[in-house]
Amino acid sequence: MNEQYSALRSNVSMLGKVLGETIKDALGEHILERVETIRKLSKSSRAGNDANRQELLTTLQNLSNDELLPVARAFSQFLNLANTAEQYHSISPKGEAASNPEVIARTLRKLKNQPELSEDTIKKAVESLSLELVLTAHPTEITRRTLIHKMVEVNACLKQLDNKDIADYEHNQLMRRLRQLIAQSWHTDEIRKLRPSPVDEAKWGFAVVENSLWQGVPNYLRELNEQLEENLGYKLPVEFVPVRFTSWMGGDRDGNPNVTADITRHVLLLSRWKATDLFLKDIQVLVSELSMVEAPPELLALVGEEGAAEPYRYLMKNLRSRLMATQAWLEARLKGEELPKPEGLLTQNEELWEPLYACYQSLQACGMGIIANGDLLDTLRRVKCFGVPLVRIDIRQESTRHTEALGELTRYLGIGDYKSWSEADKQAFLIRELNSKRPLLPRNWQPSAETREVLDTCQVIAEAPQGSIAAYVISMAKTPSDVLAVHLLLKEAGIGFAMPVAPLFETLDDLNNANDVMTQLLNIDWYRGLIQGKQMVMIGYSDSAKDAGVMAASWAQYQAQDALIRTCEKAGIELTLFHGRGGSIGRGGAPAHAALLSQPPGSLKGGLRVTEQGEMIRFKYGLPEITVSSLSLYTGAILEANLLPPPEPKESWRRIMDELSVISCDVYRGYVRENKDFVPYLRSATPEQELGKLPLGSRPAKRRPTGGVESLRAIPWIFAWTQNRLMLPAWLGAGTALQKVVEDGKQSELEAMCRDWPFFSTRLGMLEMVFAKADLWLAEYYDQRLVDKALWPLGKELRNLQEEDIKVVLAIANDSHLMADLPWIAESIQLRNIYTDPLNVLQAELLHRSRQAEKEGQEPDPRVEQALMVTIAGIAAGMRNTG
């Protein structure tokens, strides 16, 4: 174990030294000495030296305004480098990869050892694998794209330096390159000056596809194929690609007025343009590689006399011409020019697939399988995974926007106000109109701008090539009419196919009613006819946790899924559950394997569809090798969950969860909603107000400009508490509820649940991880520096609660200390704390100075503002999960 860490530690310290030299060259010896002093004080403060802790506080409080930014940047950049070293460690032969035998191989061996599972059953489970990852542009990706590129290069240098056999001069060249990259990063502003537009966010998503997924997906399929051949003697069919990517960037308009129908249309075109760009590079390689002459009669018939000399090349050159014509047409459309569609415009995946597959089959038929299974196979798999759209997009809109639009329409038509009708009347009207042959929208009606926007979006969906839009997600869905309304609006736009429409249930009440809503929908004949046996439902993690606390929310999510699975099974409907998880615990984030195995039995039968958010995209898919390992983890977990489903919880366990849910929700809401001091405390003890100034995502941080916790989006709400290290949303209420159940004499039941029920043990594991990242002395320091004395008792009460919670969680899990079973994560947190602590102390100081200036009516000092932004970004890097 320790040898593994020593490789990581030596990389971290080497990068730290290079950063130190860079700082010295840029700003002089005295700044480097100041940074070094702070680092040493932080290290011994962590080791329990109280005198040094006090000195650390004093040193940071006494920094001059000129020293603030360099010190903040030094620690922030150091954390970015530490994260890069850790990311490399996870794929390095000396690091995690060494002790982490292939996940898929391990899973297959485990499955083969189960007497009740035949090899045939395992093969069938592999063939029904389906994994759809939905990339979302959450404002949590704090790091600028330009710095991400530099970190990818640093990673490449670490990989080459790991090679023992490199010559001295190569070693020196690599070290020089590292110094250049770290100097470039130091002299680059790490904070964006402007908020990204939705189109910028979409381009960020395409960059992930190009830099990592394009290579990562074929590599993952080769790895999967190798393991299946080795363990089951089974080869993957060429057309089998179980993984798809969808994006919310440019499609998610919920609470984001910047995402309009025009933006969505633009992003769809841009995505297709990027696909032609990437496929052209692939085809160029194939034109030069496929110089073979021998071909079966079928292929020769296809190419005719003209192509007989080099049939494969001939087909590839034709495909290249079509791609170029398509690209030119898309480029003109992006510039706003209207051109007639060219001959051979590519709009469907089959048009890409057919010539490539014809070459593949011919090469196989002529005994050239070794050539067929090279670059050509990778390109075929990319066609299946990415295809003409590159990434499909989801459209997401809030339910009330559809209700408002229909209300405006019915008032215009003089048939009443749809908004004020009962649910039964709404359904009757919608079903009548859905069955009607005549259009509902009057020709010369001039709707309001809001309604026009909703109708235009439906128009974009109807005009887009089928297959480029994956689903229409309705946020804050509460009733069957919410779903029917969208189907009606799409019908009016003239859509020619059945678009999957997924209700998103995201508050505690909505999760509890989800099954009832879906049962009513499935009882409508028209609806059953439309969906053709398939239904997608989205489960919201972040808003339910913000509404009711993490314990009550996770139980409501479990029960909603459980009930929906049963209802759909009974009705013969294939259910896809779409999980809206974030990177952080308060938004449902958990290590993939644990999270999937803790879902109700049967929840992955219809495949897995899950959001990948913000900075998690970079941690999980930032490099091709990491993509392979993330996709393999998901694959192993889905196979295991489907073939060895977790046990059904005992009735007594369900009753305990009901009890925990009620108690924890009461405690959580008692503070967050009912305690009059809570919102003022949140505003002063965390950088919640200041976060609004960070140019993070294209979406505003609040749903309404004024208002309390409920109007804050889930992401800034969690972000704020992560910054001051209290991590409140991820634990408040949970421990108190557990303590109460222990006092009622049920500790042994809780211990059994922890041992034998993955759902419950994952909950406790996630609490331990949060407690390991939280820090009570830092949270207390924020109070002392920033909070009105009248509110100190509330802060103290919350910190005492957390201390009690840690004790009860350790007692139930039978652990002597936090994260006992995951030493690697504990090590990683400790390693980063030394650099995150000074940023926290400095942030409290900066907030103090900036608020003081505001109170005295002075203009904010730009040095203080800039340093504050840097500490926010740095702590986010240190915590490895922001919102």
UniProtKB/Swiss-Prot annotation:
Keywords: Carbon dioxide fixation, Lyase, Magnesium. It is an enzyme of class 4 (lyase). GO terms for cellular component: cytosol. Disulfide bonds: none annotated. One of its GO terms (biological process) is carbon fixation. PROSITE patterns: PEPCASE_1 (PS00781), PEPCASE_2 (PS00393). Its EC number is 4.1.1.31. The keyword Lyase applies. Transmembrane segments: none annotated. It comes from the Bacteria. Its cofactor is Mg(2+). The active site is at 138, 546. One of its GO terms (molecular function) is phosphoenolpyruvate carboxylase activity. It catalyses: oxaloacetate + phosphate = phosphoenolpyruvate + hydrogencarbonate. Belongs to the PEPCase type 1 family. NCBIfam families: PRK00009.1. Forms oxaloacetate, a four-carbon dicarboxylic acid source for the tricarboxylic acid cycle. This is Phosphoenolpyruvate carboxylase. It comes from Shigella boydii serotype 4 (strain Sb227). The lineage of its organism: Bacteria, Pseudomonadati, Pseudomonadota, Gammaproteobacteria, Enterobacterales. The gene is ppc.
